[in-house]
């Protein structure tokens, strides 16, 4: 079979002006970035606000293998299948970070015959959103350092600046740096560091803001440092929220592209789900809901991370909760959770599927806690055997969860028809009655304990010395009513990435809390989650090139 980029480059793209007409968007409603990309205007988003929202389908997954389980591919294939069935459908997905594209992924626009296009542009600079977020973030860093240099009227303690610089690349050498070295004219020397752009609070803010006014308010509410007497310093104290909003005035507009089958797609924002809330923008999802009868969206990594955050953090900012949740599972991942070594995953092993099913079963049970109907999608791989597929289907039937095999990677929309029919049937027959896991009035401690015991199935939560102190401080600052966003490994329910399957009787340790008051949540740090990834021994970048005619090579 052709590579992803070969398939993408073989497709005759339709002008984006034609694609968007399918959902009632005119040429005057968009701002073109070439022939095949556009941004949606504020005027159009405002005009559709009164529309009744359509059905919302959330795609999530089991705890993934390092290669991922195909959520984006499944989301795209499902949307294409729904459109093939005559349902007016839109996609609402995250945009890729250049760091993982150059590092391990090599691309993140779907795969096979379930891709969003133009995939080369989407995977590289797209419409410049990532650069705008990077610029806004680093402008704030420069303004903080300038405040120190120009007399430090706010009394900022340089040792307690928590705002870091960012870069949209994987660069481990920048995790910890010292800035301001040299003569006094170069600034105040202090420790600093870089995160990857998608870990920036500004990325989370962009994805949760409902309009420019809300964006400006959220930017003003960012905590950047503490004073010498340990009081928080906000962006509003620096009086630069207007400038940051100005930098982001176009980046906040959702991007319009198309799938291989011509399904309109809104691709906007891309926070990671292991260190942030892992969902595309509220503006993109809300607008898609008001333009289409069905909206398909995804949440990053497994349901214990992205879906939990979607349901507890994002949904309160949306016009409605999901009508159905699709959990993507692969037999290779289930076998890995069942104890099979990565090198042996291609061999048939029904017993390992049975053992690994405990992971999928827990995710199904977790999503059912939110009172939303669940469907399991088996993402088919070439090495899957009939016996393994039959084993998994039988196990799903035992817990009374609908299950369908989907081959959208190999067969595109046709490979997702059975799944699409089941999802539509479930939505029609089972009304969602969304219930949040916790209340805003719960303390931070109670929220963390709820997530750990009810979603991870952990025994208890251990709060480290710093976290214990912060629980008291954050309550004093009035931050204890915010939602919790757990920073945790994506590979396990626990904070130990090697503890696969469905572990029980484990503790989760919260070593520190990080206030993201602009985004509107508090991050709980567990384990050793990195906010600036490194590159692998053989980065995907080594296979990339460009032909003399400008055609991209090596993206996959």
Curated annotation (Swiss-Prot):
GO terms for biological process: tetrahydrofolate interconversion. It catalyses: (6S)-5,6,7,8-tetrahydrofolate + formate + ATP = (6R)-10-formyltetrahydrofolate + ADP + phosphate. Transmembrane segments: none annotated. Disulfide bonds: none annotated. ATP binds at residues 65-72. Signal peptide: none annotated. The keyword Transit peptide does not apply. PROSITE patterns: FTHFS_1, FTHFS_2. Pathway: One-carbon metabolism; tetrahydrofolate interconversion. Its EC number is 6.3.4.3. InterPro entries: Formate_THF_ligase (IPR000559), Formate_THF_ligase_CS (IPR020628), P-loop_NTPase (IPR027417). Keywords: ATP-binding, Ligase, Nucleotide-binding, One-carbon metabolism. The keyword Plastid does not apply. CDD domains: FTHFS. It is an enzyme of class 6 (ligase). It comes from the Bacteria. One of its GO terms (molecular function) is formate-tetrahydrofolate ligase activity. Belongs to the formate--tetrahydrofolate ligase family. This is Formate--tetrahydrofolate ligase 1. The gene is fhs1.
